[in-house]
Amino acid sequence: MKKYIYLCLAVLSIGIFASCKVKKGVEATFSDLDGSWNIVELNGKALNQVIEFDVARHSLSGKAGCNRMMGQVEYSDAHKNIIKFPQVATTRMACPDMGGERELLQALDKVVRFEAEGDVRPVNKIALYGTDNTKLMVIEKK
C-alpha cells in the first residue's frame, strides 16, 4: 500500500513540475533595437510604417503617417527591457486622415517595455507593451 502511495505521489509531482515548465524565448536587449524596423502591428491591427532606432544616441525616427517623427529613447541597463519614448515630436503637415498617425503616437507614448517574439538570434521581431501589459505594437527587422 505504501509503495502505491509513493508511486502516486511521484507521478503527481512529475506532473506538477512538468506543467510548471515555461518555455522562455530569446531575451531582447536594447542593442537589438538598433536599426530600421517595420511596424507590422498597432493595437492588434496590421500596419506598414517604418521606425528607426539609434541605440548609440538613444533616439528614434521614422514616419508616423504623413509626418516625420523623432524623439528620445529612455533606457537603463539596470532595468532590463524597460523602455520609454518621451516627447516624440512630429513635423506639422496637414493630411486628410490623421487618425492612424495619432494612434501610433499615442501608442509610443504608452510603451513601457519590450520583449522578443520568437526564440532565435538575431532578434528580428519585438513586441512593445504598455503599463497594463497590453501589446501595443509589433516591430519586425527590415
Short names for language-model regions:
Residues M1-T29:
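Bacterial Sec-dependent N-terminal signal peptides
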Residues C20-K142:
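Lipid interaction determinants
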